Amino acid sequence: MRLIMEAKGITPILNVSNIQATFAWFEKLGWQKAWDWGSPPTFGSVCSNKCEIFLCQNAQGGRGISALKVTAGVDGAEAADKGVWMSIWVDDVDKIHKHCLTQGIEVTYPPTNEPWNVREMHIRHPDGHVFRISHGLEESV
């Protein structure tokens, strides 16, 4: 099979209702604001190591509208309660869980050893986006 598109990376774009509040939410998790654009800012990015997430206030993404394309109904309301799910791989889920509790971040699923050999937990962003935070478990002998 001939390779048509060789991807060099992928960056999700999350639709958010308040970009400044979202920067602050990610900073509670130890992510850094990488940049923002506009005056006032309506587009920006957060990063952790080599991972980056774009943030777009009330436009691009599965819950918003933009001048280019309506992505969810006339005003975005059809998907207002539906966020994006993303997996984030870390070294220690339990450490992240404790940190989230101290920061007031909503934990929707506590750290659990899953049958697919992964320990994971879920947190929810105020706009409904869910982050599945996981680390692999060692194979049992």
Show the residue positions of the predicted features.
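Vicinal oxygen chelate
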Residues: 2-13, 29-91, 95-124, 135-141
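Short glycine-/small-residue motifs
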Residues: 130-133
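Amphipathic alpha-helical segments
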Residues: 18-33
